[in-house]
Design a protein with these regions (language model features):
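C-terminal outer-membrane/trafficking sorting elements
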Residues: 1-56
Length: 56
């Protein structure tokens, strides 16, 4: 599946597994962005804000 992000304005985006492993990084994301990701629980950091998400 994918994780979709919208409304980001020139911010870094990090995707982590729940055990802290960096799965994806993108610099200066602007507008809409999608990240391929397996189903399950992930942590995503956009700029200085972190979110816990479930991808299914």
């Amino acid at each position: 599946g994918y994780i979709y992000i919208e409304g980001v304005k020139n911010m870094p985006v990090y995707l982590f597994s729940v055990d802290g492993k960096l799965l994806h990084f993108a610099e200066n994301v602007n507008g809409s962005y999608s990240i391929p990701a397996e189903n399950g629980v992930h942590l995503i950091k956009i700029g200085n804000t972190s979110y816990k998400i479930i991808n299914f």
